[in-house]
Amino acid sequence: MKNLLLLILISPMVMKAQFKIVNSATINIVDVRQGTWPISLQRITKQSDTCFVLQFRTQEYNNSVIIKTLKFRDLEQLKYFQQGLAALKAGNNGDVAEFKDYTIKRVDVYKAGTSYILTCDGGLTNFQQPEADRMMAAIKKQ
């Protein structure tokens, strides 16, 4: 009888320790581009931590679909990305913004306008000035 009573009292504590509920949410901030070469900026919240990710299909390989993720550990890191885009927008052809985990290069193409090449962790994508403006506006709202 004592063993049964002890089992009834201890089992809820043991069971609670085995199951952990994690609150997490992924919110799409902006779909920069859709279609064959998508780019999206997302906010991921887990418990009290928030990080941001830029997901894109790498353009290095035309025959396979490889989605790369550039992770920003907090809003401050995301703001640095925005500042890099803003500095390149005001800059000239060939300017480069280098960060620890990624690099953005401005490329001016005659008749096509300004575009940017983002490289990170073996992935590469490009985007046009209107897409960069959409990202900067979305980051500014955060």
Predicted regions and their residues:
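Positively charged, low-complexity terminal tracts
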Residues: 18-142
